[in-house]
């Protein structure tokens, strides 16, 4: 008989994600799992609130995601639904267009691996309603 361990989000050390003004961003928490400065890889968990959208942003490095719990919804800048990734779905992506993300009917937890990043370019950019960069995350 297998001894299965169930994911328990209460064991995660969640931190608020900082916004451009230094205040926590709405609807998102994060937990850094590993930062490998030699390989330029960041591994972290994000938790997005159910039925909410986080701030508009653009990925500036290659990344991969794995939906751990719930479903990850991504949206185009006009607010229309781009994709739904339920628990168990993996995606590898490259820098791309602005978008926003959020949870489905329950909070979503997503593993992100950002790789490789550089010391001079941002990992991602937070954007305002005019698609202007308001904060770069390095």
Give the residues covered by each predicted segment.
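A short, N-terminal "cap"/entry segment at the start of jelly-roll beta-barrel domains
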Residues: 1-40, 126-138
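Short acidic-glycine-tyrosine-enriched beta hairpin
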Residues: 37, 76-103
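Conserved short histidine dyad/triad with adjacent acidic residue
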Residues: 39-58, 90-96
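Conserved catalytic motifs of the protein kinase core domain
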Residues: 41, 63, 107
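Glycine- and acidic-residue-biased ligand/ion/polar-headgroup-sensing regions
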Residues: 50, 59-78
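Double-stranded beta-helix
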Residues: 102-138
